[in-house]
Every structure is written in C-alpha cells, then in structure tokens.
C-alpha cells in the first residue's frame, strides 16, 4: 500500500517537520511510531487490496479528526501552494511573500516544516509539471517556445530541470515517452519521471 499526499497533506499525520524525511524512503515505524504496528496488523487481516484501501482511508480519516484544528501557518502554506499551482510555478517567491504579508525567510521556514522543501523548489516542480503537460506527445515540439511559454529564462534552464527531474534531456525524454506509448493510449508524461511528491 502507498499514500500520495498533496504538498501540504502529510503534515497533520506527523509529529515532526517534513524536511526530516523529504525525498526519502523511511520505514513506517519511523513515521507513525505507535500506530505502525496497529495499521500493519489490520492491513494483513483484510481479504483484498480494495478492502485494505478502504481500511487505510478510514484509518487516515480517524487520525485526521484527532489532530488539532488547522493553524494560521497551515492556511498560509495552503494559500501559497494554491497561488503557485495556479501560476504554474512562475510566481516569484518574493511577490508571493508580499501578497501574504510575511518575509521570504518565514515562508521558507513554514514550507520546510509543513511541506518538506522550499517554496522555490515546489514552484520549480509546478513549472516543470506544466512543461510536461504542455508538450504534444504526437507532434513535433519546439522546445524553445515551450521554455518561454512555461516561464524558463532560456532553453538551457529547461534542459537543466529536465536532467534533474528525469535524467534525460527533453528530446530523449520525449523519444522514450513516444516509444512506450501505444496506439491512442498515451502514458501520463509524469509517470516517466520521478518528481518529488506533490
């Protein structure tokens, strides 16, 4: 079983800053200490994967009800994430901080604690996600035009992100994507790269 949280979705279930486990694989016992064996035992007893997913969702909802109410810090981060996502990661962190009415440093501290990474890095991920969703997977691609449209300074800036997130340059990535796509059924372009969870 696995859980994919939104960028600010995991914090209510943890008692420590997300920066301590960001982009890492950690044992369930290290994350949920006292609950780990309880949930593990319950999941082993279910008859099917579907039943396990239902059980796990119920378990998460119960834990969520036990957590304190949403804080001002969580509201700030939620607002910032929504603004970044709406602008596909192109909104400057300084402008965002000014909109919210807090310093960039304070916003950075909140993001490290509640999201696990910096606001700048999350914006970078949203911008790259926008690139992947903007690319035609069946027609020729003008990478320079894509870079400009998605808020990159130039093509080398886009290439740097491609290599960082996928291990390939844009052309090789698209070639691989087209090879593994079959007929009219195209794979989700995000499935071919390892973006830190959103």
Task: Give the residues covered by each predicted segment.
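DNA major-groove recognition helix of helix-turn-helix
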Residues: 111, 123, 161-162, 174
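Intrinsically disordered, low-complexity sequence elements enriched in Ser/Thr/Gly/Pro
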Residues: 2, 122-125
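Alpha-helical bundle regulatory/interaction domains
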Residues: 1-94, 98-104, 117-118, 133-137, ...
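Major-groove DNA-recognition helix of helix-turn-helix-type DNA-binding domains
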Residues: 114
């Amino acid at each position: 079983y696995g859980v994919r949280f939104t960028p600010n979705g995991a914090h209510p279930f943890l008692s420590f800053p997300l920066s301590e486990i960001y982009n890492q694989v950690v044992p369930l016992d290290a994350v949920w200490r006292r609950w780990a064996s309880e949930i593990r035992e319950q999941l082993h007893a279910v008859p099917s994967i579907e039943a396990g997913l239902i059980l796990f969702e119920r378990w998460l909802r119960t834990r969520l009800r036990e957590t304190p109410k949403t804080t001002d810090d969580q509201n700030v981060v939620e607002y910032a994430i929504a603004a970044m996502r709406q602008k596909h990661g192109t909104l400057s962190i300084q402008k965002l901080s000014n909109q919210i009415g807090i310093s960039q440093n304070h916003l950075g501290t909140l993001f490290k604690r509640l999201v696990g990474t910096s606001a700048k890095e999350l914006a970078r991920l949203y911008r790259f996600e926008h690139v992947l969703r903007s690319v035609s997977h069946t027609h020729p691609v003008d990478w320079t035009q894509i870079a400009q449209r998605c808020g990159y300074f130039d093509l080398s800036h886009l290439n740097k992100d491609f290599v960082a997130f996928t291990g390939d340059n844009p052309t090789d990535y698209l070639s691989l994507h087209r090879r593994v796509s079959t007929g009219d059924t195209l794979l989700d372009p995000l499935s071919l790269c390892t973006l830190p969870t959103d």
